[in-house]
A protein has these predicted regions:
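Alpha/beta-hydrolase fold catalytic core
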Residues: 1-24, 46-49, 87, 156, ...
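Conserved HGGG/HGGXW glycine-rich cap/lid loop of the alpha/beta-hydrolase fold
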Residues: 11-62
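Active-site loop/oxyanion-hole signature of alpha/beta-hydrolase fold enzymes
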Residues: 39-42, 51-92, 246
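Catalytic nucleophile serine of serine hydrolases
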Residues: 95
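Flexible "cap/lid" loop of the alpha/beta hydrolase fold
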Residues: 99-107, 112-142
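Conserved alpha/beta-hydrolase catalytic His-Asp/Glu region
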Residues: 126-128, 140-194
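Conserved serine/cysteine hydrolase catalytic core
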Residues: 178-219, 225-228
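Catalytic active-site module of serine/aspartate enzymes centered on a nucleophile-bearing elbow/loop
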Residues: 223-259
Length: 259
């Protein structure tokens, strides 16, 4: 795996490249870093060139954190794809990361072959109790036992161990990303341009209850392929990394049939 830096002037993006083949970009969840994909990346790298950027404010990535929108984060991703040959790439976004993936596909369709939604929110607005758990789960001023309660509620399947997510949080990054999301009209990114979409749904995700499972396919039609992953909640990646990798590899094989 190779570490690289992308210098865009006032913005610098640290990212990691692993493997060769079609370009696959992995974008992490709200307030979290590229390390969340550590167990997903290696199997993907057997068939793909996997790129995992650190969001602004994490690691060596830097840039304005206020007065920005999802379009600014999408520009970071687009510049990275161009730096790595222009793709077109499969962009995979986990939770918040799928907002950035969909914005990139909308703003720069020439760079995007497909979009994978990993644990995407299917209910809007997010129920107040879930939203509270999302925010408090990363509140480092709270005791671990209290944070574990919130992590279990918002992120993990009943049989999963939420302690793996006691660490890895970047509260200031999380705050900036949430503000940027609120500053971006949903209509500007919701449809992910015209790219094919893989909707990877954890079966125990509180943000994808049974009545909402077909939401994206109902709205966007045959562009959307649904894959359900058992024994996983909204966190998904630490719970079922092998299943996530398999779903992404299968989707990539459809997008890049000659490779």
């Amino acid at each position: 795996m190779e570490r690289k830096l992308l210098d865009l002037g006032e913005v610098q993006i640290e990212y990691f490249v692993h493997g060769s083949g079609p370009l696959v970009v992995l974008l992490p969840s709200l307030g979290r870093g590229a390390e969340d994909f550590d167990d997903v990346r290696p199997p993907l790298a057997h068939a793909c060139c996997v790129v995992t950027p650190q969001p602004r404010g994490i690691g060596a990535s830097r840039g304005p954190m206020s007065g920005i929108t999802l379009h600014d984060y999408a520009r970071d991703v687009a510049a990275l794809i161009e730096r790595e040959g222009g793709g077109p790439a499969l962009i995979c976004g986990h939770a918040f990361g799928n907002f950035v993936a969909r914005t990139t596909a909308t703003d720069r369709p020439d760079l995007v072959r497909g979009v994978a939604l990993l644990g995407a929110t299917h209910v809007w607005p997010v129920p107040p109790d879930v939203r509270e758990s999302i925010m408090k789960s990363s509140d480092l001023s709270l005791a671990d036992d209290e944070r574990l309660k919130y992590l279990r509620h918002a992120f993990f399947a009943p049989a999963s161990d939420p302690r793996v997510w006691l660490s890895g949080w970047h509260p200031e990054v999380k705050k900036a990303q949430r503000v940027a999301t609120d500053a971006t009209p949903q209509s500007e990114w919701w449809q992910a341009g015209t790219a094919p979409i893989l909707d990877v749904q954890p079966e125990s995700d509180v943000m994808c209850p049974p009545e909402s499972q077909s939401r994206y396919r109902d709205e966007l039609g045959d562009r959307v392929t649904i894959v359900r992953i058992p024994n996983a909640g909204h966190a998904l990646l630490p719970e079922q990394p092998a299943a996530v990798a398999r779903a992404l590899l299968d989707f990539a094989a459809r997008l890049y049939p000659a490779t």
